[in-house]
Each structure stands twice: as structure tokens, then as C-alpha cells.
Amino acid sequence: MQLMSYRTEGGIRIQREISNQPYRPADNALAGALDTRRGVLFSSSFEFPGRYTRWDLGFVDPPVVFTARGRRFMVDALNQRGRILLDPIAETVSALAATTVEKNSANRISGEIEETKERFPEEHRSRQPSVFSVLRALAHLFASSEDQHLGFYGAFGYDLVFQFEPMQLRLPRPDDQRDLVLFLPDEILIVDHMRQSAAIHRYEFEVAGTSTSGLPRATPHDPYRLNRAAATRPSESDHGPGEYAALVERARAAFARGDLFEVVVGQLFAEACGDLPSVVFQRLRQANPAPYGALINLGQGEFLVAASPEMYVRVEGRRIETCPISGTIARGRDPVEDAERIRELLNSTKDESELTMCTDVDRNDKSRVAIPGSVRVIGRRQIELYSRLIHTVDHVEGMLAEPFDALDGFLSHAWAVTVTGAPKLWAIRFIEEQERSSRRWYGGAIGRITFDGNMNTGLTLRTIRMQDGVAEVRAGATLLYDSDPEAEEAETRLKAAAMFTAIRGPVSAAACMSFTAAVGCGRKVLLIDHEDSFVHTLANYIRTTGAEVVTMRPQLARSELRHGANPDLVVLSPGPGRPADFNMTGTLELMVERHIPVFGVCLGLQGIVEYFGGSLDLLDIPMHGKP
């Protein structure tokens, strides 16, 4: 056990205790607890050198939650421990300009951010009054370089962009929509899969002589609720067949006018789900490992289950980085087909154009807050392999200029071009005009802002929103003038497919087999080996049908056939040289005489052709090993 104590910039004294835990079951137990208790589990189950490692961290029963919708915000104490923190929080927020604050009860303060009438240069857009002003003030209240894990954890909704870029909204917003839910924990489980270690960090807070020490950590339960009426709800989308393709055509018209260069438009899929969020999360994590996996109990019966492949913004010290993803193709059935798909993706000029444009916009986002000359691409069109998809990814970094911080970097990218488009402001307007429903959390971010000034967030993609027995998945495609409407509609459905596999339950391995194992059962195959380097691979392929396969060199095979061997099939293997080098004519005479079916591969086929009167010639360029 390790103990330490420190004082934050806002004068709060914090005592931290670190205790080691058993490695294996740690995160599984936490996932189950989240079915009934508010909190977060972030899980990175994907590795990429210099970018991602495997870890889990999370908690339940946070003492404080910060929520916002539009320009209104609330800070709630969820237990007596949180009430101790509410007074310094209220004092800090009340000192902000353009902010009205009231303490509604011993457990809640609320307020509203006034829209600014001040003019400002674009470089300072991230400093206009918004709910992020409150978040920045609270981060300063708890700020300290002594700890790298304490901070705000949760979800950032898509509509937060309208505090950065205000505009007229067309789509109605659901009454229960929230734009921001962030928890302040007092106990964090941290699992390092590289080191195979786990530990719990526990925090006690002292404010003006009053401490949380000894107070219970529990908070009221907020379980997942199943709605019986939802159990019979059919699968549905907010676009009918062909309607998304028609939307693509409208986007192409905007490209032709020069209104847009690219835009990411999505459709929403929904269906009943009777399983608990933790069950769906475990299935999704197993089937679709990702660097930004998450299970979040947001409270009010709302859950997010995520397997996001894309970093949104990560800040460590003054370094800010992003990893834009654009360019997608389905995985192959095996590594050989994967290689073919990767080649196809890398040779696609459309996909290259998509990613180039995304990265150009991303570099522009950083340039608003970065030291001149520090923004650079450190990885170009790198391949990342996921369960069903292959992506091309760029890696971009910069150095934050003074006085900007991680929140400035976060806001300057709102939202990533890979979920909006370019020019970004016009793309966001197009999305508001053309999509059928509010995005809620989709296209926003999940992650944490730690009080040491760092940040790690992933884009809210490949994410299931669960509430009242209904699971929702939103998926989009990056549209360009060259887009094929039907192909783009198919891409959105492909992206959603992995999510619905987790929602509906696992598919058995037998159902995924591309052949019927019984077709060769009871059959005997003689494979004649012409000194080839691939004969045993060929034999194994045949055995997968259930057939019994025996491999022999030509002389032994002919001897066995003369002495009564009676296979159901003889396979003549590939090999070097010419058929005459192996007396293939003598072998085939026995086949014809005995009426035994024969199948030839490469050299074997050549021997059959010659035996029945055909002729062979040499190619100008040998083709062995070429596709």
C-alpha cells in the first residue's frame, strides 16, 4: 500500500492510497457493477506501436457528476462525500464571468452561461464563454501535478459543437438529451495488461477542515431498465431503403456547387435488446477489440457501450495528437485475402483523397492553438486492422502554444472532420439539415481530462446507446463527389453490423464455416507428390472435407495401385520440371485402366493435358509466385 498527500491549486487537500489488486478478474467485476451503479469503464484492447497499449481503468459510485444541456449546467453531489466538495465548486463557478449560479439544494448547484456579445479573433474562439469555461475552472480547482489519474471521466455530446460554432438548429432535440456527463471519482481501478497488474487508487478530500475520510462511498443505484413493450420492437432505421443513397446524391450536388468538399452523414439503427449493458460490452470487446472501448452508466437509465477505433484528442504535457481515420474496406476471410483488401485500399485514389482532406483539416484545427511550425504528420496512411474492417490512419501531432491548454485543443477540433466534413462549418450545417435525428452522443467524444493538465479522448464511433431495452447504433460514411451512393449506404450498414452482433449475441463458429465438413467423409484420396513444396498444404485442404488422404511419391503410388489400392480420387500435385520427369504418363495409364477419377494441379494438370494429346509451351516470363 502506498500513501501520499498533496494540496491542489484551489486549496483542497487530497490524500491518495494505492493498493494492489488481483490482475485477472478486476475489470470484469467492475463491468458487472456498472449495470446498476453510475460510473465508467474505459478499456483499450488494441495495440499499435507508439500509439496504443492495452489497459483498463474505471470506477463506480462517483461522489460528483457534472452535466450540461445547451448553455445550462448542473453539478450534483451523489453522496455525503460529494456534498463536502460542493461548496468550493460553487464558489469557483460563481467567480466566472457571464455565468449565473444558484445552489438549488445541499446536493446540487446549477447555472447558465450567457452568450457572449464580445468580438474575438478566431485564435481565441475556444475561450468564449461556454460550459467548457466551467469545466476549465473546476479543473483548476483540483489541479496538481502530483497525480495523473484523478480527473473528470465521461462523455461529450455532439451538440457541444454549437457552443464553439453557434448556428440555427433544425432537428428537434429529445427532452432527455444531455450534452455532457462527467464524473469526478474518488476510487479508480487501473489495470495494466502489459505488466499484468491491477491497483485501486482511493482518494480522500479535505475542504476547510472537513474531510471525506470515513464517509461511505456508496451512491444511490441507477440500474438498467428493461421495457417490456420494447421487447417486441422490430429492427428499424431512420432511413428507408434507398433513402440514404438519395442523401448521397444531394451531397454530390453540394460538392458540385463548391459548398462542400466532403461530408460525413449517418443513419440511425435501433432494435430491442434484452441483455444487460455489461454483457453487450463483454461481447463487443471480445469481437471488436479497439483502443477506445467503454462501458458508461450515465445515470437516468442511459448507457453507452463503445468500441471506438479513433483517437479524438490526446494531450500529454504540451504535446497534442490525433489519429484521423478515413478509408475503409471489409476484412477478408483470411490473412491472404486481408492482404488483397489492404492493397486495394491503399491503391484507392478516393480513399487517399478522403484521408488527405481529413488530415489537412485536422492540421488546420491544431494550427489554431499550436506553436507555429510544430504541427506535422508523423504517420501516413498506416493500416489498422479491426474485427470486420480495415482502416487507413494518419497520425498528427503539434505542440500547444501558451496560454492554450488541453481544453483549447479539444475545442479547436470540435468535432473531428472524420465525423463532420470540410469545410467543417458548412458540413455541420449540412448534417443538421439532412440527417433525420439528433446525434446525441455520436460524433462527440468519450474519455478523461485529468487534473495534471492531460487529456485522453476517443471519438464516439462504433458506439451503442442503450436505454429502456432499446439499443441504438448510428453509423456514417465519408462522402465525396466521387462517392457511389449504393456503396456508401452499404458501408454504413457494414459499420453497424459489428455492433449488432454484440447486441444480438455471439454467432457460433460452426455457422461461420464457409464449407460443409462432411462432404468428404468416407472417401479415400491418394495424393501423388511430385517433389513439391506445397503438397502437404494441399493435403490438409482436402482433409478439411473429412476425406482420408495418403501422400506418396510417384513410384510408390504406382506400385500401390498395381497391387490393388483403390482410392476414390487420385490428385496429381504440382511440382518442378515437366510431367515426363515423373513418368506421369505411366501414372495416368493406371488411372484410365482402373477407372479412377483424377484431378491435377499445375504440373499434374499439365501431365493430364499431354496424356490426352495436348501440348505444352514455356511462358516468356515465369509466373510462379505471382497473382
Region locations from a protein language model:
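Extended alpha-helical targeting/anchoring segments
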Residues: 1-522
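A short, well-structured beta->alpha microelement
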Residues: 23-25, 544-561
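Short phosphate-binding/catalytic loops that engage adenosine nucleotides
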Residues: 259, 547, 596
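Conserved acidic segment of CheY-like receiver
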Residues: 524-529
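Cysteine-nucleophile active-site neighborhood
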Residues: 564-627
